[in-house]
Amino acid sequence: MSSKLVLVLNCGSSSLKFAIINPENGEEFLSGLAECFNLPEARLKWKMDGQKHEAALGAGAAHSEALNFIVNTILAEKPELSQQIAAIGHRIVHGGEKFTKSVVITDEVIKGIEAAIPFAPLHNPAHLIGIEEARKAFPHLINKMVAVFDTAFHQTMPEEAYLYALPYSLYKDHSIRRYGAHGTSHFFVSREAAKMLNKPVDELNVITCHLGNGGSVSAIVNGKCVDTSMGLTPLEGLVMGTRSGDIDPAIVFHLHDTLGMSVEDINKLLTKESGLLGLTEVTSDCRYVEDNYETKADAKRAMDVYCHRLAKYIGSYCALMEGRLDAIIFTGGIGENAAMVRELSLKKLALLGFEVDHQRNLDARFGKSGTITTDNSRLAVVIPTNEELVIAQDASRLTA
């Protein structure tokens, strides 16, 4: 076992994902999820030594109780594992314009994360709680904590990509611009694609599609992000599990003025009640949509809108590739497993030279990477993402 393992923490508003990883080879020694915070059924599930475990955290438990359980119960049984933790990596959803790369966490960095709260009001406060509680639980690692930002990879976007056509003062005075998300995933799969294609990263032109409950597409030219589908917040862009993605902004005024909805209700509608859930009126789960595509009108409707939007984004990003596209990459829970989403979306891009190989597409699921197009087609591939490994590697590198 390496003496330089990294504890990776991803703190959400009502959950905490964690893993202990060897940054050199990606081996996981512990992984788990604490969920249902502040509810009677608060619990923690984890996997260690190939065994799955679950425990109740107690009614109303949250980040503090979860981290205490990890330290005082799980790791107490494995002191040799605890002693190997040399750094802690924190996933941070929004770094604003301040953070263009991962950084060691200082009081100044914490202020920067606080300043970006308006752009990630659910996520950033939870990340700050996670940092505070981790400092208490691991006092000897206070100077060995690293923040890895979902927005950092997109900070190479040019002004024409990140500016909205709003009064320029809103950008200058209030930092209202496009930031993107899922940057760690887009970074990872683009680097894996460079290895797969045997190309230097700085010569790589790819379009990466991170499709999960949230989803985004990025245009990567010469290894750098030049555009991405999410905007000021993760609400812009693709159809998602419960998020609408792109809409006519005037719909907001219509919902308020004509239907009498409050701003809070509209926010909830667009972020929690739209997307696949809104289109099916049944579920946000893409597996339902795929399984029932041929037999249920709601599933077909949702799938068709989802793939139409995805194909539009991929097609538009082809215009940014400076004359050469090396591959389209699918990743994330849907991108890695939903063969139908990939096939229906790529069929719409036949003009660009894409032809799906049905069997290859079916084979590239459940954690398997691979080409999903025919030998005569422009290339599309599936690459499973590993954001935790990127976070672990950055934490290890910056605290060495």
Swiss-Prot record:
Provide the binding site for ATP: K17, H210, L211, G212, N213, G214, D285, C286, R287, G333, I334, G335, E336, N337
What is the first-listed, main subcellular location in coarse terms? cytoplasm
Output the Gene Ontology cellular-component terms. cytosol
Question: Where in the sequence is the active site?
Answer: D150 (proton donor/acceptor)
The record's Gene Ontology biological-process terms are:
acetate metabolic process; acetyl-CoA biosynthetic process
- Residues binding substrate are R91
Cofactor(s) it depends on: Mg(2+); Mn(2+)
Q: Known PROSITE patterns for this protein?
A: ACETATE_KINASE_1, ACETATE_KINASE_2
Q: Which GO terms describe its molecular function?
A: acetate kinase activity; ATP binding; magnesium ion binding
Q: How is the cofactor bound?
A: Mg(2+). Can also accept Mn(2+).
Where is the protein localized? Cytoplasm
Q: Where does Mg(2+) bind?
A: N10, E387
Look up the record and name the pathway of this protein.
Metabolic intermediate biosynthesis; acetyl-CoA biosynthesis; acetyl-CoA from acetate: step 1/2
Locate the site labelled Transition state stabilizer.
Answer: H182, R243
Coiled coil (UniProt feature): none
Q: Which reaction does it catalyse?
A: acetate + ATP = acetyl phosphate + ADP
Query: What's the stated role of this polypeptide?
Result: Catalyzes the formation of acetyl phosphate from acetate and ATP. Can also catalyze the reverse reaction.
Family, similarity comment: Belongs to the acetokinase family.
This protein's assembly is summarised as: Homodimer.
Give the protein's recorded name: Acetate kinase
User: Upper taxonomic classification of the species?
Assistant: Bacteria, Pseudomonadati, Pseudomonadota, Gammaproteobacteria, Enterobacterales
The record's gene field reads: ackA
